[in-house]
Amino acid sequence: RGLDLVICGSFALLGILVQWVKWQQLARSISPELNWTDGLYSLLGGAALGFITPGRLGEIGRGIFLARDRASLTVLAAVDKLSSVIITIGLGLFGALALWPQYRIGLLLALIPFGIGIRWGWKRWGEGGEVVSQVSSWGAVIGWSVLSNLLFMSQFYWLVRGSDSAHLVVILAIPVVFALKAMLPVAFMDVGIREAVAV
């Protein structure tokens, strides 16, 4: 089990590294002078806030740990989180459609309220459009979000697989677990959330 822990820890560190690079890229579109140390400080500060808030909403408070452009950086942090959630749910939908193709219409219809909520929030947040328009590398941001999701899903797979070899059903079910967890309205400190959803 020692090797398994090392592998899981490596996945976690790689996931943090990817999030760091993505956040640095986003934040520099507003604050070009932001150095890597301050970017990491902001990322970890937001993660700490997310850990003690329902739904990890505190993560969007990364901007308060920086000296300038706090409001704009808070908007970008919200967009960063939203992009990750969209990718998570997209991967979960892919897994669900592969596992339960007979329910594909119902699964697609279930996304409608989620899409309406995103559109409503986007239109309501007036400052978002102006700030987001300053980001020129959305392809890279989405790519980092996909990679981050895959790393954390791989870590979870390694934790639940035990001594068993790879099983396609388990591999497809893990994105579904992450998607369901992402859509839960309250997930205080993430304690046992993924495990409960997995059961």
Q: Model-derived features: where do they sit?
A:
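Short intracellular "coupling" helices and adjacent cytoplasmic loop segments at the cytosolic face
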Residues: L44-G61
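Hydrophobic transmembrane-helix microenvironments that flank and shape a buried ionizable site
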Residues: I16, R56, A77-K81, G192
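Hydrophobic alpha-helical membrane segments of integral membrane proteins
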Residues: R62-F65, T74-A77, V186-A187
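Interfacial segments of multi-pass membrane proteins
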Residues: F65-S72, E195-V199
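Membrane-interface alpha-helices at helix entry/exit sites of multi-pass transporters
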Residues: W36-D38, D69-V85
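Helix-loop junctions at the membrane interface of multi-pass solute transporters
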Residues: R28-S29, F51, R62-R68
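Predominantly cytoplasmic-facing regulatory/coupling regions of multi-pass membrane proteins
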Residues: R1-L43, T88-V186, I193-A196
